[in-house]
Amino acid sequence: MKNKLILAFSGNDIFSGGGLHADLATYTVNGLHGFVAVTCLTTMTDKGFEVIPVEEEVFAQQLASLKDVPFSAIKIGLLPNLEIAEHALAFVKQHADIPVVLDPVLVCKENHDLEVSALREEIIKFFPHVSIITPNLAEAQLLTQKEIKSLEDMQAAAKELYDLGAKHVVIKGGNRLSKERAVDVYYDGQDFEIMESPVLASNNTGAGCTFASSIASQLLLGKSPLAAVQFSKDFVYRAIQRSDQYGVVQYEK
């Protein structure tokens, strides 16, 4: 039987709605022992929301500290720069026998074109080494360099990401295509699965982190990729229903 040790590469959300807080809460409600290698800190200042990467050496030391822990799954969240991403990829390559879920968080950097371009290329290098990728619609556009305006566009983007090396792809459409229905597209190289749920007006901060962490948890616990995705979509829906002013809530209040 697999152990229940699961790792996240993620940032510290100062308001605890997303990032490592969402990851660890999701792991806990799934009965797993969660670990985190912190990639960045965040602050809210007069200038707005800021992401502060940890020093490259500090991140490398975190990974070195974890080298002998027998993880059964990994979830990858916000990788704030190329250096952090390179260390994360090297670590993932050393764990080729376990499920790895990549949430390619690029949107917070969309105003820094040169940095995003380099990071995009590095993130694509992860694709052959992970079990599933979970970009939202904006991230899928950045990764494919194509605009997505319809369900057919989402399907074409999922196929393109698969062709770039991803084994399983979920594109989270959210409410960008419809204000009433949240539409996600799953693709495994053969078949598409269209998943819909009502759009909620509640705070959805941390929903993407929770979704990816839930998928990683369910893969560890033995579900197939599609079953893990379907379970996790429902899990996130309920977490959004329970959300407070800081973000989604993974546990029963």
Range-by-range predicted roles:
Residues K2-A8, L20-V107:
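Conserved N-terminal subdomain of the carbohydrate kinase-like
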Residues V116-D191:
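Conserved phosphate/ATP/ADP-binding segment of small-molecule kinases
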